[in-house]
Amino acid sequence: MIGRLSGVLLEKNPPQLLVDCNGVGYEVNVPMSTFYNLPGLGDKVVLLTHLTVREDAHILFGFGTNEERNVFKQLVKITGIGARTALSILSGMSVADLAQAITMQEAGRLTKIPGIGKKTAERLLLELKGKLGADLGVAGAVATDATSDILNALLALGYSDKEAMLALKQVPAGTGVSDGIKLALKSLSKA
């Protein structure tokens, strides 16, 4: 298995990269979250990898973080979710957002990802329930009822998922709903 690549970034054609490792060029497929954080062409890059071996191809997938790679491995274990679909899921939302959607059983958030229909989203919720978070080291994946209410309030006020999640991280655990909303709004006004 190839677990890690360290080399020079030669080409970037989303979602594929070409990485030169001591004269050998590796084609690596990466999620868009990793793609956006890549250095420029000709610069050194380090990727954590997962090799998928099929009858007709060996495909290398690369990730910027261990969390992404672990979630990818969990996703490809699910019936009906192949490596390309798993890559699409990780391109469509961050690991933290995915963990939040799974924890809160929000199939609607998952169906916004291209290639994920209602049945696939429900299968993801069922198969991954309780597996994301502690097992994968995703901080804050388990939401309390208050956290859920605060998040829903921020979304109802028109904030994006990303903005709401960032604001939610500023709210201490155990904070009540009304105080949590006030703290979250205060952190959003500073941004």
From Swiss-Prot:
The keyword DNA-binding applies. Disulfide bonds: none annotated. Residues 137-141 are annotated as: Flexible linker. Residues 142-191 are annotated as: Domain III. CDD domains: UBA_RuvA_C (cd14332). SMART domains: HhH1. One of its GO terms (molecular function) is ATP binding. Has three domains with a flexible linker between the domains II and III and assumes an 'L' shape. Domain III is highly mobile and contacts RuvB. Belongs to the RuvA family. This is Holliday junction branch migration complex subunit RuvA. It comes from Janthinobacterium sp. (strain Marseille).
